[in-house]
Amino acid sequence: MGETAWTGTPVIPHPDARDNDAEKLPWGGRREKLPMRWPFADAVEGFRSKALANKQYDPASTFVWGQMMAVGLIEMLKAIEAAFGADGHDVARAALRKVGDRIATEMIDGVEKPGDLSPAELSSLFASWINEVAYASIENPKVEGDGASFDIHYCPHEDVYGAFDCRVQRYLVEGMIEAARRHWGDGMIDVAFATTIPSGSRTCHFDMFPKGEGSDKWFEYSDRLRDRALKIVDVK
């Protein structure tokens, strides 16, 4: 990737992002501690039994299809913001949040929290399900005391998106967070990002920490991105 993403958004390539050992990290095993479900379960089974069972089918074509849908959503959001300003942005963000909520609800509905999990452990395992299943990523998670963190070593969008484009994924996560808190209570801890691959880092790093009284870091940063987006399209 050069200094401009496929979407036209600026990026800062990191020389080691392509060689950050993603291929050596474990995937999937820790999720067994929290027995959530795959969303789109019937469709997933159809994909496995029809497409993946076909030895001539290249799963990379599914990747290309997914990127096409993703960049189409970026362009749609930018066009809505340019044409309808704050109202357009808010409607689009709410729609993405609704989708994220529904996906997470399918994953956790009827799932009981193991009694021996701390809020940090529960939040970390929930994040692993979101990272690996919903976002098809490869992560390196840690739980330390009452907090947790994870590094994303591979994200399907890392060579297509610019850093500002990642806000679309953020809005989906808003709904996922709301679903988790509704299901397991407000004890689910807050989350904030520190670095991203498109903004010049080797990995995307996220920190998870106890939610402060009257504070919600994930949603607060989303609001700041809203203001930035509307300035870009010069909304008066």
Regions found by a protein language model. Give the residues of each.
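Phosphate-moiety recognition in structured ligand-binding domains
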Residues: 150
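N-terminal accessory segment detector
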Residues: 2-147, 156-172, 179-203, 207, ...
